[in-house]
Structure formats: structure tokens, C-alpha cells
Amino acid sequence: FCLSRGLGDVYKRQGVPLGILATGTACVYSRNLGLPRGLAGAALAMTGVPRSMDLGWASLDGGSPEPFLVATGMGRDAETLLGVRNNLKKRLGWVAYVRAGLGTMGRHRLPLRINGQPIEAWTVLAGNVGRVPTASLFPGARPDDGRLHVMHLGVDGWRDWWPVLLTGMTHSRRDIGKLLRWETAHVLIGSDIPRAVHLDGDLRTAARSLEVWIDPGALLIRCRGSIN
């Protein structure tokens, strides 16, 4: 079950606090909130302090908006998901994504657009939070900062990856030539032909456009008094 799929109903009942248990997509998101796992996490999901958190929205080819918690993107990162088998995902968790990613990291950049401007990118990501397992995509990003965090990853082959991986693993905020990040309220990612798109790690139908924005404070989530 992907947590983001159930957020539409929660969003319609604004004002009702949401408790999160750390499994699947919720596990990645809960780490950004500093939520514990196990019994402590279950107790916090029932009794934690309600705090306002942002919610991401994405529209593919002008279709109905879909909510997300962690990140969405167009390009090679979404293609990686084609190689993630469900049985491996259940058995290995996020390691299954890393394993599949090794098969796409060496592929060349794609012709894409950001807000109508032509670019070449391995992928373009838009995130609501900053951290994923083993790395920080958007250092300093918080789930309640009211901002959309965008990454243009312009690697083109294996050699370009090493400084990018080092930047992610050291949680560095410094951008490099192949890695550009910025904050905004809205971004439109486009392509002349349908490209792979993912939403919180779930592969979606290939699309020519991916419009993304943040709804600040849209969710009430039970947390600790402060976010780590």
C-alpha cells in the first residue's frame, strides 16, 4: 500500500490528525519527521502532537492532481522503477531500488524542459522532504517549510556520478556542475515524447508533462513536539 494513494481522502477531511506507521512510503516520510518505529511509533501515531505539514501535488498531462509526500520526477530515475520487481521490493526494501538503479546510472541524458526552457537531464525531481535512505536529496528541506524543492540532475554516464553521490552521502548543500537544486512554489517538467514518471516511488503512466506544486500546511500529522 502506498500512503500517498490514501491522502486524497485525508485531505478532504482537513483538521483530522493523521497518525503514520513507518512502513513502505511512510517509512521514508516518517524518517524526515523523526518518527520512531515499532511500538513507540505506534503510540506516537495515536497520541502525538498534531502539527501542520505540507502536501505535494502532481498533475500528469493536465490530468487530475495526485498527492505525494516524498518526491516525484520524470526521467531515468522513474525508468529505474521498471526494473524493481515486487518480490524484491518486499524482501529488500529500498535496497531493491539501489540494485535496479545500477542498470540505469550509465544511461545518457534526456531532452526535457523545465518551465518551458529546454534542458538535458538524467532526471528532474521535485520533492516535499529532503532525505531518502543513504542520502540527502535536498539538504535543509523540511516537511513544513512551505516550499517545493527541485533538482536538475545532468549526469551523462558513470564518470559524472561520483561527485554527485559524494554530495548526497555527505548531505552537502553545495551544488556542482551536474547537480542543480533550488526552491520554488511550482514547477512544470516537460518532454516532446512521453517519459517515465514516478510518484513517491510508484511508477505512473508515461507523460509529456508533469506539473508539481506544494500545498503548505495541508495535513495535520501526529509527531513529536519538534522535528529532528
Model-identified regions with their sequence ranges:
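Short acidic/glycine-rich loop or secondary-structure boundary segments that cap or lie
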Residues: 77-80, 120, 131-135, 158-161
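Glycine-rich phosphate/pyrophosphate-binding beta-alpha loops
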Residues: 73, 77, 125-139, 203
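A generic structural signal for short beta-strands and their flanking turns/coil linkers
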Residues: 108-110, 120-122, 144-149, 183-185
